[in-house]
Amino acid sequence: MRYKCTEIELHRNDNGKKIYFTKFFCPDSYEDRNILLVHGITSSQHIWDINYKDYSIVRFLAKNGYTVWRLDIGGYGKSDKYEDGFEVTTENAAIDVLTAMEKICELQGVNKVDVMAWSWGSMITGLAAELHPEY
């Protein structure tokens, strides 16, 4: 199967920090379903795409019709770092997730986005849902 992965320009409105944000999909099985994957505390978005046998969650979702969106929470991976490590909080991470969800809705013309998270990412998405349940 052919897959496409592109980086989307994304910055937070409140602090201007760049969020590393990618879109991954398979044109052959595209069904206009969107899912945002949120990583845990010890990794980055690349944990979702392990290039070994059938271990890639990203490729599994894409070949089953999803447009898969991933972000690196601020301070992780390729996202901008914070000068003060104590700014990497669940609250700041929830704002990163909400910024990404708003961008997905804008780009895809949708009102809601499915979410998959693990570890700390589950706490982040729970707070994001509490702050803005409309997504």
Protein language model annotation of sequence segments:
Residues M1-Y30:
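N-terminal cap/lid segment of alpha/beta-hydrolase-fold proteins
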Residues S29, I104-N111:
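Glycine-rich phosphate-binding loop signature in dinucleotide/nucleotide-binding domains
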Residues D32, H39-N51:
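Active-site glycine-rich loops that stabilize anionic/oxyanionic intermediates
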Residues I35-L37, V68:
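Hydrophobic beta-strand anchors of alpha/beta hydrolase catalytic cores
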Residues H46-I47, D72-V88:
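Glycine-rich "HGGG/HGxG" loop immediately N-terminal to the catalytic nucleophile
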Residues D54-D80:
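Conserved alpha/beta-hydrolase
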Residues E87-L107:
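Alpha/beta-hydrolase active-site loop
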Residues N111-M116, W120-Y135:
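Conserved hydrolase catalytic core segment
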